[in-house]
Amino acid sequence: MSILNLARTNVLTLEPYQSARRIGGGSQGNIWLNANEYPQPTFYMLRSSNLNRYPDCQPQELLNSYAAYAGVQPNQVLACRGADEGIELLIRTFCEPSKDKILFCPPTYGMYRVSAETFGVAYCAIQALDNWQLDLDTIYAQLDCVKLIYICHPNNPTGNIINPSDIRQLLDITHGRTILVVDEAYIDFYPTASISSWINHYPHLVILRTLSKAFALAGLRCGFILANPDIIKLLLKVIAPYPISRPVVDIAKQALSTKGIHQTKRRVANIDINRNWLIQQLAECSCVSVVFPSVTNYLLVRFHPNYHVFQSLWKKGTILRDQNQQIGLANCLRITIGTSLECQNLLTALQALTLVSHKE
């Protein structure tokens, strides 16, 4: 008997999430602008001892630190292994397989769909409007059996914030019916748009956060769920007994210190400078059709198809993120904002590509 006969049926047909690292793992690239990572390493002193002992399930000092940073109470915070685990925890906690649904609005982050499929939960994909805002009328019409709505804010890969009044309308219409999950993985690049303070007014609001982006700790795998205490208590029934290792807690606490937060704000300021410069320069490239506005550490760019930008740059060692298969994103690439030198090298490569195309 084949071992495949023992696997769950939905796993056999599951299309796994193609992370930037998985896609680009075999490349010899030297400029990695595909994973929305911070382009330079951060340095922390590992102070953990007693590694022979299991860590606390939810280290109180870490919860206190992140609560202070996010402007919520410690009992409204749950620490997890990146925001991706938060996505899965919510589905495992609130959705009955083969009965309930989740809803999301493409083009958006692909893990919402993959996580639902992994656990045998159906999904409803409501395409965003042309300006990548929520199609509220269609969402309202599709709420039957929907337990969770995932809204990415700012949205990945488009880089725009979602209209706060639309989020509030969605919260009002789903009260007592559906949990609204707002994924704020990139909110540290535009903190004034955060709705974390709304948790006190909406018991069905959940917010996802991470240290992977602005805090430059993608390799640490540390994220947070912000929600009312009743939701946190339910999630604690489902989460692994020791989700956050002592070294992760150690480094995360340093990142959330006064000094660490100051360093993060400096990184965000540097990214803003590089992003604004790159927007101006890309707009002058003849291979570029549209540079979409962004408040994050990445840009969505539509290229003229005849330049074959993704493949051409890949061969030269510059790795971008292809978004061509996403709804409404034909000929689009997502470009992580790198160092000033990486941005300059990218621009030089695009200009060279343009020259070659003109000669042909």
Curated annotation (Swiss-Prot):
Top enzyme class: transferase
Pfam families: Aminotran_1_2
Keyword terms, alphabetized: Amino-acid biosynthesis, Aminotransferase, Histidine biosynthesis, Pyridoxal phosphate, Transferase
Gene Ontology process terms (BP): L-histidine biosynthetic process
Pathway where this protein functions: Amino-acid biosynthesis; L-histidine biosynthesis; L-histidine from 5-phospho-alpha-D-ribose 1-diphosphate: step 7/9
Catalytically driven reaction(s): L-histidinol phosphate + 2-oxoglutarate = 3-(imidazol-4-yl)-2-oxopropyl phosphate + L-glutamate
GO MF, one annotated term: pyridoxal phosphate binding
Cofactor(s) listed: pyridoxal 5'-phosphate
EC number annotated for this UniProt entry: 2.6.1.9
Residues modified to N6-(pyridoxal phosphate)lysine: 213
NCBIfam families: hisC
Family matches, as PANTHER family: HISTIDINOL-PHOSPHATE AMINOTRANSFERASE (PTHR42885:SF2), HISTIDINOL-PHOSPHATE AMINOTRANSFERASE-RELATED (PTHR42885)
Subunit structure: Homodimer.
UniProt record similarity statement: Belongs to the class-II pyridoxal-phosphate-dependent aminotransferase family. Histidinol-phosphate aminotransferase subfamily.
Protein name: Histidinol-phosphate aminotransferase
Organism from which the protein derives: Baumannia cicadellinicola subsp. Homalodisca coagulata
Name of the gene this protein is made from: hisC
